[in-house]
């Protein structure tokens, strides 16, 4: 078996970031492999989220906060100055892209092909060729052509997704995995420092998964046996990282 990593956000900002990261990974997977019409589901989910909420101001504030912190770290001894400089330059470039006036993904609303598909994709079984002949035609194109189309569509979200990837990398880097034990399947922790993300790495051979709850100063982890779908009463060894 292999180690599986589970993550639980402890605030709404990180919760939103993780959702967007999840969709971004699906977009990348669809760009590299021909998944036929399934490639549109994460694209339309991203369109929906970006229309409901303008993440730009929140992300820009987060970029500024991290640039300030990175600048302080840069003055310390025994730090990886190259890595810090990489994040400073990358975040500065991402900030410049995100400050452009147009909203991410807004131009896709003018695409008649995507608009027709999006109306149907929310309906069960409504992607048949008699419902969407234009989709049937597009799927018959060579993969290389469809790949170029898909790349052009998802590039509209790069100004948003690029800084979120960087910000989550920095968040995860604030803590290393340490050994921990859940006695009778339960573990509880607290922190004087405000936390934003709890990460649990556990061997799938244990046959269980964690359910994590909490807020920025306290969290609890319950392990559930998958086969029985009930709380485990065994001691579970796992790795824990609590990120600020």
From Swiss-Prot:
Subcellular location: Cytoplasm
Gene Ontology terms: cellular component: cell division site; cytoplasm
Keyword Cytoplasm assigned: yes
A Pfam match: ZapD
Gene Ontology BP terms: division septum assembly; FtsZ-dependent cytokinesis
Family affiliation: Belongs to the ZapD family.
Quaternary context: Interacts with FtsZ.
Function in brief: Cell division factor that enhances FtsZ-ring assembly. Directly interacts with FtsZ and promotes bundling of FtsZ protofilaments, with a reduction in FtsZ GTPase activity.
Protein name: Cell division protein ZapD
């Amino acid at each position: 078996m292999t180690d599986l990593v589970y993550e639980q956000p402890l605030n709404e900002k990180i919760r939103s970031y993780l959702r967007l990261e999840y969709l971004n990974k699906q977009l990348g997977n669809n760009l590299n492999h021909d998944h036929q019409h399934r490639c549109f589901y994460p694209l339309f989910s991203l369109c929906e989220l970006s229309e409901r909420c303008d993440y730009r101001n929140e992300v820009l504030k987060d970029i500024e906060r991290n640039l300030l912190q990175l600048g302080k770290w840069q003055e310390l001894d025994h730090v990886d100055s190259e890595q810090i400089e990489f994040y400073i330059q990358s975040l500065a470039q991402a900030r410049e892209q995100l400050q452009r006036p147009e909203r991410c993904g807004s131009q896709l609303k003018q695409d008649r092909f995507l608009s027709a598909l999006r109306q149907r994709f929310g309906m069960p079984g409504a992607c048949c060729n008699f419902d969407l002949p234009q989709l049937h035609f597009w799927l018959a194109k060579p993969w290389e052509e469809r790949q170029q189309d898909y790349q052009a569509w998802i590039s509209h979200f790069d100004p948003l997704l690029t800084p979120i990837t960087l910000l989550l990398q920095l968040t995860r880097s604030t803590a290393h995995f340490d050994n921990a034990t859940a006695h009778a399947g339960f573990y509880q922790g607290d922190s004087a420092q405000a936390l934003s993300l709890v990460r649990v790495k556990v061997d799938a051979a244990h046959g269980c998964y964690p359910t994590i709850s909490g807020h920025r100063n306290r969290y609890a982890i319950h392990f559930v046996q998958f086969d029985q779908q009930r709380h485990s009463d065994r001691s579970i060894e796992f790795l824990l990282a609590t990120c600020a």
